[in-house]
A protein has these predicted regions:
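Conserved non-cysteine loop/helix-boundary elements of the Radical SAM core domain that shape
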Residues: 1-95
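Short secondary-structure transition/capping segments
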Residues: 16-22, 43-48, 76-85, 111-120, ...
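Detector for methionine-enriched segments
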Residues: 29, 35, 108-110, 183
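A C-terminal junction/extension of Radical SAM enzymes
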Residues: 70, 74, 78-148
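Charged/polar, solvent-exposed surface patches and flexible loops
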Residues: 5-9, 98, 178-181, 185
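Radical SAM enzyme core and accessory elements
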Residues: 124-196
Length: 196
């Protein structure tokens, strides 16, 4: 969202002026720009979402990913039984369609998550030829990832497409003291896993 009040409530502090500066620098360096938006944030109305989508129109982007809020079991929102605002999915869908068509963005991947709002699907849109291969590989679990930091997940996969994918996971503790205590052991396990 570009709604600074909602971001503050979520402890996500945002400075649009700084964002625009970094965006302009990335544009100058010919980076492929992706924006990810989450629909269904606490206290976000249909009008808030539509305003955010109107703001997105002002940026020259190659990728847009629309996520629907999924409540993770360990999150405060899940524990507190968060109930999302009633939002007009039809209006939002119309706006997304208008923006993606205007910008020449076409859907190239979709997935669902547990505990997501009724709309439920996450869709990645892209200009042709600028699709994020990383996103596709992560969703397909055909890409190994090395997770660093509290709560990060390392996934090691054989990357097989024509056979059963083998996947091993190592999850870092979220709690800081447990993370620090177990950091060396988990790091060694990850290195061993990637040396296979």
């Amino acid at each position: 969202t570009f709604n600074e009040e909602i971001l503050k409530e979520l402890n996500r502090y945002f400075d649009k002026e700084y964002f625009d500066k970094v965006y302009a620098e990335a544009r100058e360096m010919n980076f492929v720009i992706n924006m990810d938006l989450i629909i269904g944030l606490p206290n976000e109305s249909t009008e808030d979402i539509l305003r955010t989508l109107d703001t997105v129109k002002n940026y020259d982007i190659e990728n847009l990913t629309i996520h629907v809020l999924a409540l993770k079991k360990g999150s405060n929102l899940y524990r507190e039984g968060h109930i999302h605002e009633e939002i007009d999915y039809e209006k939002i869908e119309e706006k997304i369609t208008s923006i993606t068509e205007t910008k020449g963005l076409k859907p190239y991947y979709m997935y669902r998550q547990k505990n997501s709002l009724e709309w439920g699907e996450n869709i990645g849109y892209s200009v042709e030829g600028k699709e994020s291969i990383f996103n596709i590989q992560i969703i397909e679990e055909s890409q190994s990832t090395f997770g660093l930091g509290g709560g990060a997940i390392t996934k090691f996969t054989n990357g097989a497409f024509d056979e059963e994918i083998e996947l091993e996971r190592i999850v870092n503790p979220k709690e800081p003291l447990a993370y620090i205590k177990e950091m060396r052991d988990r790091f060694d396990k990850k290195v061993k896993l990637f040396k296979k």
